[in-house]
Amino acid sequence: MSVARLTTYNFRNLSSVAIDLHPKLNFFIGNNGSGKSSLLEALFFLGHGKSFRTSKVEHLACYETDNFVVSIKDVNDLQLGLSKNLQTGVTLIKINGERHARLSELAKNIAVQIVTPESFKLFFGGPKERRRFIELGMFHVKHDSSKQWREFNRVLKQRNACIRHNLDKATFDYWTGLFCQLSEQVAEVRSQYITNLISELPYWLEILLPNIADKVTVQYLQGWPQKKNLMDSLNDSHEREQAFGYSIYGAHKFDVKFLIAKQALESQLSRGQQKLFLLALTFAQAKLIARVNRVKPILLIDDIGAELDINSRESLSQALSILDCQVIITAIEEGVLQPFIDDVSVADKESSKKTKYHMFHVKHGGILPVNNSVKIE
């Protein structure tokens, strides 16, 4: 998918927005707090039904308003819209003007991937951040995984309640059996997804981090000891669970470790190299989504200049030209964008007369096109 037109109403600090985007490359330049990240957040919200910046949906509405709308039209005139009324709590999902009940219906048409300065939490934020990254990708590749995950969490809550309240053995055994069954199902789907993701990674590492590409390994930890089945692991940890008051093993405890020569990746790479690895991993996930879901993702990169020197940005420009999807990039200064602007490989291939990119200035929530980026060449 490529977004041709983005419209927002009452979203964050943005003025009412209606902008036309380039099918390949778009730049938004502005100071911190100008609204650049809010624009990315609007697109992310449409693709996932939640924010990458806050868990509180009320923070997404403009000051002193109680509703907001995000909608797009793609290059084939497909229209997608998502609105939220904070007073009633109603979320309205529309596809070509028709109401739909589930976000998974939107996910079949739009896939959004993002890299932000906060993405470093993938390395330093603990297992929760790595789980979040994997789940955001699975949401688009395995549309029924969200339903499966909701059912698993329902059973997890019941089993934890049994532990905390020391319920009778029959009730506890029932929920434990169901918990093990669902854990194994979730782990199998997740393992397959991660295997497919890892298979896409080396190609992008060769472009972005060629010196370490053959040294990187990815380790999937299912959430309980590899050499034991889950039921045995739970039985052996019964006293510990009683002391803690929750399930210490299961699919909710999975993790993914990124290693270089068997050492934690973050201990071996500079911040700039870590960002390039994050980008390679995101590109791998984007290509996997496109291959399986047959929907080209929209890639959002917030603050492109942070951590990346000129050589890294040139490598990134090369990778983006190969990725073949719509890219939306924010930056504080126009100068950091020069490698991307200079790279003629991002030119629109359909006509040499079309512009190679669109550029916008963002100031106080207002978005204005830069004249020379929208002229016909």
Swiss-Prot record:
GO molecular-function terms, A-Z: ATP binding; single-stranded DNA binding
Main location per the UniProt record: cytoplasm
GO cellular component, one term: cytoplasm
Entry keywords, A to Z: ATP-binding, Cytoplasm, DNA damage, DNA repair, DNA replication, DNA-binding, Nucleotide-binding, SOS response
Annotated localization: Cytoplasm
GO biological process: DNA replication; DNA synthesis involved in DNA repair; double-strand break repair; SOS response
Disulfide bridge map: none
Entry's transmembrane regions: none
Residues given in the record as ATP binding sites: G30, N31, N32, G33, S34, G35, K36, S37
Alphabetical list of InterPro entries matching this protein: DNA-binding_RecF (IPR001238), P-loop_NTPase (IPR027417), RecF/RecN/SMC_N (IPR003395), RecF_2 (IPR042174)
Short name of any one Pfam family annotated for the protein: SMC_N
Cited function: The RecF protein is involved in DNA metabolism; it is required for DNA replication and normal SOS inducibility. RecF binds preferentially to single-stranded, linear DNA. It also seems to bind ATP.
Family the entry assigns: Belongs to the RecF family.
HAMAP family: RecF
Protein name per the record: DNA replication and repair protein RecF
